[in-house]
């Protein structure tokens, strides 16, 4: 096919500009990204070669070769992986196919190190070559295609690229970087080796370079006619833990997770028995930008007998652990395993159970750490992934107790919104006469902390958990008790503090009798707005509050469902009034303004719990009328 010039997709032009002008101080990443792509090409060949061994073309020894030419001022990255066809070269090098392109650009922070990590995460690492090169030439032939169907792709990174048909005997891809002025320091074996060993030492393929030796006569380093392997070239997880440094684990994590930060913790072990596999699992220090997207692909890299199978084997982890990164290498699964087989395999079920237990053990070690550094790591983990972990209470019945021990909440025990109180902490501080774990749900920490429902608890010195995450109401439908102590909402049902409130109960009953006519008239005045009006002892400073009946949905959950566009069943709350409050004491059931006072007490209670008024204008009008009547 003839020489053809094509234009880059608009997003690629934007990306090229970013690469060239914004990431220069982090230019070493170009080699990391191109080596990573070459490694992926080898993985793809291994995978496709399982079904068609002829793709190896009698050249089964996969490798990456890196070279440089001082005279031509070029660096080459050559692999004998899967290669590309003409259409694949156009698609992979001329467009960004990923749906998250816009998100990529919105996530750029200006922090060069962070932005450099995003490049790999979005699969656009090839373009990082333009940081150091003003022209890139790619020659490639897909395994299985004839030599005359190879292609040359070339671009100066300025908006278009050319495609030519060429002859190429070797399958795979050769990338030639024509260096920009001022980049000659890269034309050195020592410099390139140091970059490879810094970023790509963990790559399982051998990375070859021409040997370089000192020539006494010439007084300089000269290239020899033989290659040497410049990386470890063995799968990290297959090596003994004692032979792997923390730095090597960290580099490997950054490779598999496309993350610039260090992991919080990791675990590495071999499992033998009914299922044989090796697992290397990491907990990241921060959540990926798309963790809550519907199409987020969690899961681990799956290998079978060291042969790469797939990138995101979701079946190996429950959804609530989707943030865990790493590798599972199975000795038992068939090499032709598919996603469908993964869903039905007994071996996979055993691996999933084992991986889940190991991941939870990893979190337990952090959560129970005695030293300050470990505690800080768990706080970091919780702020990033706490809401995701809460999903496990509904998803994983077998491990529900273990997950419950890992939960952290804000509470009235502290003065900040920090979620650092475990259920075990709460139980250890319970009053001797206290039989329940109390909580309140609200939209914000401020709203929860100032909820009128907490007044009697403050008076009695009883701790209350402050739950403000959107997942909390759902979580509570699965978390009914902890350590034999039932969880109870302070805003639901008829409050019973057991022996803690015997005196108040007697006083409440007496006060209730005294204002019984007023309570009955209030119910008439409010009509269908409320299920019931009753006297309460849960208030000490506020005149009124709303509570849900024992089996009804809370107001907070109703608001959440409405915000999510779902139909929330209409619920009638219970209005509780404080007989000791001056506003309640002055209520006169026979006055003309009695109905307005009743509605005001209801509306105030609704606002105090974070609710929305159905008719704000009437509320303002009613309040103004009552204020004027008082002033008069």
From Swiss-Prot:
Function description: Molecular chaperone. Has ATPase activity.
Record flagged with keyword Chaperone: yes
InterPro entries: HATPase_C_sf, Heat_shock_protein_90_CS, HSP90_C, Hsp90_fam, Hsp90_N, Ribosomal_Su5_D2-typ_SF
Superkingdom of this protein's organism: Bacteria
GO MF annotation list: ATP binding; ATP hydrolysis activity; ATP-dependent protein folding chaperone; unfolded protein binding
Family, per entry: Belongs to the heat shock protein 90 family.
Locations listed in the record: Cytoplasm
Pfam family, one: HATPase_c_3
Organism, as annotated: Burkholderia ambifaria (strain ATCC BAA-244 / DSM 16087 / CCUG 44356 / LMG 19182 / AMMD)
One GO cellular component, as annotated: cytoplasm
Annotated region (C), positions in chain: 560-632
HAMAP family the record matches: HSP90
Keywords assigned by UniProt, alphabetized: ATP-binding, Chaperone, Cytoplasm, Nucleotide-binding, Stress response
Gene: htpG
Subunit comment: Homodimer.
Transmembrane segments: none
Region (B): 340-559
Protein name: Chaperone protein HtpG
Region ranges (A): 1-339
